[in-house]
């Protein structure tokens, strides 16, 4: 049995709900075929807005996946999280028959907005009709921790649980928190969920940050590391991963991929210190016991904002050398899913390790020479993959990095 300081956390199940891909394999196929999930907003009239595009999930019908009693009390983002948690737990084989105690099963979630759609609707009732018309479920449906609570209640997961807020890096932070939790107790297992809903208020409010693309063409609006990059497109969805104690996973025959995750905050503006993304990546490598030479592919944050792309490219060049490792940003096909983006990229990294292929950065034209990146473009690239680095950044200094390896970097595909 591993001692607490050496106990490994492994990913044993995953699921994705994202634009272009409802379900893990559908999502993976959409990335490999270059299916663009970005389109004009269809849930409200966006014609008056300077940005009218988003990555939307169009094929999710909540009543097909959840009991009717849950629908009046849940935001759409919570419905995504509940359905995806069901799929991930099934993928991991975690349930009553798995032999895991309820008090060893926990939930860690991250969201940057909470139940915004639900709140937007109920506040409209408050303003237009009065407080008597506001749903009693508003008391918790808006809350940042609601996904943790709803998943734990639905699946009788009574163990250590948490809700994190780390802007667009929050999803990877949740992975790190789950890893630390699992390492504290033999047999512990955490469901890690990060989902986001793209709404009228949430999408339009991002315009004030000055980083959202106003390009009208869905094929050219979000172009990470491209000469024509002009901002990002918001999207909805995310992923759920099951993080488990390796000894427990081994005992029940689960497939295993190792995961390590540190996080770092950017220094204060004007301090003269470099951004902390590189330090987060270095720590992820160190905790995984790897060097930059061991990394087969980087799933980049890919902001689509020239100055942010340049900063990330410089970080990768310092760490790996100019064009020293294949880099991809598959979120160009889905939009940035806020806290859900990191876990969706992590799911893609796990699938890339499984199938030994790197998905391309969609609709890319040309990398600026100054970036010195080996960016995977045009079509997927087959490669011998044993370890992947996944990066995520949020506004106001949030940075997170995760390293995943295939069966402990032994270059074997899972069976």
UniProtKB/Swiss-Prot annotation:
PROSITE patterns: KS3_2
GO molecular function: 3-oxoacyl-[acyl-carrier-protein] synthase activity
Gene3D superfamilies for this protein: 3.40.47.10
GO biological process terms on file: antibiotic biosynthetic process; fatty acid biosynthetic process
EC code(s) of this entry: 2.3.1.-
Pathway, per record: Antibiotic biosynthesis; granaticin biosynthesis
Main EC class the enzyme belongs to: transferase
Ketosynthase family 3 (KS3) domain span: 6-406
Classification via InterPro entries: Beta-ketoacyl_synthase, Ketoacyl_synth_C, Ketoacyl_synth_N, PKS_Beta-ketoAc_synthase_dom, Thiolase-like
The organism's place on the tree of life at top rank: Bacteria
Pfam (any one): ketoacyl-synt
Acyltransferase among keywords: yes
UniProt keyword list: Acyltransferase, Antibiotic biosynthesis, Transferase
Additional facts recorded: This putative ketoacyl synthase lacks the active site cysteine.
Family membership: Belongs to the thiolase-like superfamily. Beta-ketoacyl-ACP synthases family.
Record's protein name: Granaticin polyketide putative beta-ketoacyl synthase 2
Gene (UniProt): gra-orf2
């Amino acid at each position: 049995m591993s001692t607490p300081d050496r106990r490994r956390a492994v990913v044993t199940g995953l699921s994705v709900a994202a634009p272009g891909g409802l379900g893990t394999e559908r999502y993976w196929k959409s990335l490999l075929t270059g299916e663009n999930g970005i389109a004009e907003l269809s849930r409200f009239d966006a014609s008056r807005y300077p940005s009218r595009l988003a990555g939307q999930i169009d094929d999710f019908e909540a009543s097909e996946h959840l009991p009717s009693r849950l629908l009046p009390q849940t935001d759409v983002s919570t419905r995504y999280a509940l359905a995806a948690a069901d799929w991930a737990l099934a993928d991991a084989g975690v349930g009553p028959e798995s032999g895991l105690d309820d008090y060893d099963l926990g939930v860690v979630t991250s969201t940057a907005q909470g139940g915004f759609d639900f709140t937007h609707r109920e506040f409209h009732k408050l303003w237009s009709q009065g407080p008597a018309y506001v749903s009693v479920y508003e008391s918790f449906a808006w809350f940042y921790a609601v996904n943790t609570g709803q998943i734990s209640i639905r699946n009788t997961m009574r163990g250590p649980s948490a809700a994190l807020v780390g802007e667009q890096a929050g999803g990877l932070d949740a992975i790190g928190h789950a890893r630390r939790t699992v390492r504290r107790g033999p047999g512990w297992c955490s469901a890690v969920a990060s989902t986001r809903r793209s709404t009228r208020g949430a999408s339009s409010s991002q315009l004030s940050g000055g980083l959202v693309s106003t390009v009208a063409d869905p094929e050219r609006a979000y172009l990470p590391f491209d000469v024509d990059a002009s901002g990002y497109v918001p999207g909805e969805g995310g992923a759920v991963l099951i993080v488990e104690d390796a000894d427990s996973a081994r005992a029940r025959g689960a497939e295993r991929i190792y995961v390590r995750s540190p996080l770092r905050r950017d220094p204060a503006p004007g301090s003269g210190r470099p951004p902390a993304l590189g330090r987060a990546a270095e720590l992820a490598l160190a905790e995984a016991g790897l060097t930059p030479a061991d990394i087969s592919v980087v799933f980049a944050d890919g902001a689509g904002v020239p100055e942010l792309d340049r900063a990330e490219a410089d970080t990768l060049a310092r760490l790996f050398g100019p064009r020293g490792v294949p880099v991809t940003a598959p979120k160009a096909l889905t939009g940035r899913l806020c806290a859900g983006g990191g876990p969706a990229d992590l799911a893609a990294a796990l699938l890339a390790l499984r199938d030994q292929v790197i998905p391309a950065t969609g609709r890319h034209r040309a990398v600026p020479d100054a970036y010195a990146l080996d960016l995977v473009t045009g079509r997927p690239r087959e490669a011998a993959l044993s370890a992947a680095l996944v990066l995520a950044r949020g506004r106001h200094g949030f940075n997170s990095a995760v390293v995943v390896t295939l069966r402990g970097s032994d270059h074997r595909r899972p069976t």
